[in-house]
Design a protein with these regions (language model features):
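Flexible, low-complexity segments enriched for small/polar residues
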Residues: 96, 100, 104-144, 149-334
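Non-catalytic, conformational "gating/processing" segments within enzyme and secreted inhibitor domains
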Residues: 1-117
Length: 334
């Protein structure tokens, strides 16, 4: 992998493999011997029973003592303990030149945009290697404070601050768990998590239950009918898209069950005296002030169409919240 995240190719234009099956086996051997933590009052055995309260423990007699050839030809000598082999194997991966662009690219996709430019990835990868960014960081390789600062303060990330400078590939779809959490958090909701978790699960993302060790969606997923990457769109179907809409509908107009409480009183009070100001406040809260004039006019028209009555102001606030939080402009995070 090049420092900008693009693949290195051989003379025939094929990607150059980073590792072989033999190296995968060597890493597996380096990790042998580790088992579940011992339960209180128990005794460490070769295969401890499932117990999750604590770090894994090493049963040394179950560790492979042979030599292991890892990435870049690094050899772990025979006879090392399981703890030393584990640390050396992790160091071998951490110091591989592919790691900075690989990790940087994935972090950018999760935090800023599904389609970072190679130059963006390269800038962040360089910070990963140096461990410092504009005075932030320890100077050690992989310093996450420096890396995250470089990601969020990069010009390619900050151009989204001004809708006029944004481009079509900016941003990324909020994955279900973050979509649900962000809506709840925006309005100060409290919850036992039951119904919100059900909604996220029905959107295709059951918390802590990824279908594989490679996360809920692949980083190289291309949105059908386009050439754009959109990892989170791998979970998006007609059915899950409707679940998103139904979630916001229940949140705004009814409830998410007895375990979740929220109040829209602040916005209802604003709607009772100035519906336009209420829409503007929600624009600032949910869209950071990026709502277009056309969208504002349409939402305000829907708000003003709510018939007069005892609950008019509340329904006006709920209508605006529903329309904004279910919109593509909100669901795609910029």
């Amino acid at each position: 992998m090049n420092n900008d995240g693009t693949l290195q190719l051989d003379g025939n234009g094929n990607p150059i493999p980073t590792y072989t099956q033999a190296q995968v086996t060597a890493f597996a051997n380096a990790y042998t011997g580790w088992t579940y933590p011992t339960e209180p009052g128990g005794t460490l055995v070769k295969h401890n029973p499932q117990y999750f309260l604590g770090p894994m423990e090493l049963f040394e007699n179950n560790h492979d003592l042979g030599s292991k050839t890892l990435l870049l030809g690094t050899v772990l000598p025979a006879g090392q303990t399981g703890t030393v082999d584990l640390q050396d194997a992790l160091d071998n991966i951490f110091n591989h030149p592919n790691l900075p662009p690989f990790v940087s690219g994935l972090l950018i996709q999760h935090l800023v945009t599904s389609n970072p430019s190679p130059a963006y990835v390269s800038r962040v990868a360089n910070v990963f290697e140096s461990g410092t960014f504009q005075g932030i960081g320890s100077g050690q390789r992989g310093d996450m404070q420096a890396v995250i600062a470089a990601i969020l303060l990069d010009p390619e990330a900050r151009r989204g601050d001004n809708p006029a400078t944004a481009v079509a590939t900016d941003g990324h779809l909020r994955e279900p768990i973050l979509y649900v959490a962000n809506v709840l958090r925006a309005f100060g909701a409290t919850t036992d998590g039951a119904q919100p978790v059900n909604y996220a699960t029905n959107m295709g993302q059951a918390p802590m239950r990824s279908g594989s060790v490679f996360n809920f969606f692949p980083p190289n997923y291309i949105i059908p009918g386009t050439t754009m990457l959109g990892p989170e769109f791998d979970l998006q179907t007609t059915a899950t898209a409707l679940v998103r809409i139904n979630f916001v509908n229940s949140f705004a107009f009814s409830s998410l069950g007895a375990g979740t409480t929220v109040s829209f009183g602040t916005y209802a009070n604003m709607a009772s005296s100035n519906p336009g100001a209420m829409v503007d406040a929600l624009n600032a809260l949910l869209l950071h002030g990026t709502m277009s004039a056309t969208d504002r006019a349409d939402i305000l028209a829907a708000v003003n169409a709510v018939p007069a009555g005892t609950n008019q102001a509340t329904l006006q606030a709920e209508t605006a919240i529903y329309l904004i939080a279910s919109s593509s402009q909100y669901q795609v995070m910029h």
